[in-house]
């Protein structure tokens, strides 16, 4: 995909919806390598890791003695785990796409904060992450940050793919619409109407 075609199509979707999908960006050999490393780290429980029981989200085990308490949620610190992940994060094509989306020619930096991880979805005990804006995790003066999500496997409705509310990145909801954990309160009518606009983002490996 050329820089110009990305600028014409995906960048417009990004500005309008707050996200965009670049299909078939990563070849099979490369995402296969990343998936193999991630699977190996999962099987060996290589720290740092986060378990579902640690977060207590809906659907997660209640405590460490409950069934499913050993269900993994995330492999943390992906950037430091293996050179393959670092090379992916610093890939020139990733940089070109981000520069286009952010409409900048300045140097870009990789943040190793919250989203520096490998997400997993295990059958039975994977929890539901409630509705939120990613900025809830970031304590920065400027909001010119973009999360890059690479699918290492098929992601669809059957296995808990990502869901988004298009255009919600332009909203600035009153603090009263969030709970103490900065999730949208589903009991409020104004939030219900917003959540009803949600769509699923199904991905293929390499998207």
Task: List each model region and its residues.
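Glycine-rich, charged/polar anion/phosphate-binding loops
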Residues: 133-136, 149-150, 195-197
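Short, charged/polar surface micro-motifs in flexible loops or helix N-caps
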Residues: 94, 123-125, 154-157, 170
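Short, structured patches in soluble enzyme cores that scaffold and shape functional sites
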Residues: 117, 133, 150-154, 166
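Double-stranded beta-helix
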Residues: 155-207
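Short, conserved beta-strand element in jelly-roll/cupin
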Residues: 139-157, 202-205
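Short loop/turn motifs at secondary-structure junctions and domain boundaries
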Residues: 3-4, 142, 192-193
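Non-heme Fe(II)-dependent double-stranded beta-helix
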Residues: 1-17, 23-131, 137, 177
